Design a protein with these regions (language model features):
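Predominantly soluble domains enriched in secretory-pathway, periplasmic, or organellar proteins
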Residues: 23-367
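Sec-dependent bacterial lipoprotein signal peptides
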Residues: 1-26
Length: 367
């Protein structure tokens, strides 16, 4: 596997399945950066224990060389997404924990994940990762996603289930009895330590600010787009929808400006990303379309929108685009500097790469 020459930049991509790509500048060096991959221990006795492996990226050819001293423990079980802060030496890993039945992160309200946490690491010399003795916890149940804002000031975690169902109606409207949530943290730029950002808009029945921000039930993914954090949620039975919060870059605060979700008229969405001024939603539904009078079938669709008033998605002129005919069960999209690439992840496949500033990556992995 090779990377093209990157130049002096820092970039990170974290996707579902636990993928982290970190590029750091190394002037006058044969190493242009480091790539980190999260996964689980292959030992049968520790099959769910999380680990982080790492590679040096060769300056000229992009060849990968294992970093001495890695892998290290991720600080928990079944690591999922990870975040490398732009311009920083800190890495945050979301360990999703494990259920009590088979030890996987496939958790529900009745079979919850235990041991879920966010572990903090610092990048040292030669790309070595050292855990900082700091472990943080989201406020909800069964965390599934996390990202940092573009400035690296705030970290957000998407939880499958809010800790208190009575709070759902307070933010989402009367009659709502179940929901997920977003936990927000402020990042200390010196230590990397996380401090909880409480909900300044919604208070609990006791009059205390909620320590989280409710989102519609069955959340799938979320994204920062323009001045909104948009959550994608739903099931094949109920259909998929998006729900926006107005985002403050100064305080990290999220504010509800509409209580209802926006239906997308799709039912198997797997990802939402923001790139090049657009929002892209990946739908894993098979559907037919006509080209030149010929009916063709696509196993997935990519929907492009722009963000309108109050965070509502407005369909782009190009509308929907059929996914590659050979890619089934896609789960993520990768933004590249001039295009969006659909990505299929198979079991155990946890390594991808995407865009960089400056020169384009010439080679992309698809399928």
């Amino acid at each position: 596997m090779k990377f093209k020459k990157f130049g002096k930049t820092l970039l990170m991509i974290a996707i579902s399945g636990g993928v982290t790509l970190g590029i750091t500048s190394c002037v006058q060096s044969f190493t242009v950066g480091y790539l980190y991959v999260t996964g689980t221990n292959s030992s049968a006795s520790a099959s769910n224990a999380g680990i982080i492996s790492g590679f040096k990226i060769d300056h000229n050819k992009g060849n990968l060389t294992p970093i001495n001293g890695l892998p290290v423990s991720s600080g928990g079980a079944n690591p999922g997404r990870a975040v490398l802060l732009t311009g920083s030496r800190f890495v945050y890993v979301l360990n999703r924990g494990a259920n009590s039945t088979d030890g996987t992160p496939n958790c529900t309200a009745t079979n919850q994940c235990s041991g879920a946490n966010i572990s903090l690491f610092a990048i040292g010399g030669n790309g070595i990762l050292s855990q900082q003795g700091q472990t943080f916890f989201s406020q909800g149940i069964n965390p599934i996603r996390l990202f940092a804002d573009t400035a690296g000031n705030f970290l957000y975690v998407l939880d499958s289930i809010a800790p208190d169902s009575t709070s759902c109606a307070l933010a989402l409207g009367a009659g709502v009895t179940s929901c997920g949530d977003i936990t927000a943290f402020k990042i200390d730029p010196t230590t990397g330590r996380l401090t909880l950002v409480v909900n300044a808009q919604v208070t609990s029945a006791s009059g205390q600010p909620l320590p989280y921000f409710p989102v519609p039930a069955n959340p799938i993914d979320f994204v920062l787009a323009s001045s909104f954090i948009i959550t994608l949620s739903g099931t094949p039975a109920t259909g998929d929808a998006v729900f926006p919060y107005t985002y403050s870059s100064a305080s990290g605060q999220l504010t509800v400006n509409q209580n209802s979700s926006q239906p997308l008229n799709i039912a198997q969405a797997t990802a939402i990303i923001s790139a090049s001024g657009s929002v892209w939603v990946l739908d894993a539904e098979t559907a037919s379309y006509t080209v030149g009078g010929t009916v063709q079938t696509a196993p997935s669709w990519i929907f492009q929108s722009t963000v309108g008033a109050n965070g509502a998605l407005q369909p782009a002129v190009s509308g929907s685009v059929p996914g590659p005919p050979t890619v089934t069960n896609p789960i993520y999209l990768i933004p590249e500097s001039k295009s969006v690439v659909e990505r299929k992840l198979i079991e155990g496949d946890r390594l991808v790469f995407g865009p960089k500033s400056g020169n384009r990556i010439k080679k992309r992995l698809v399928g």
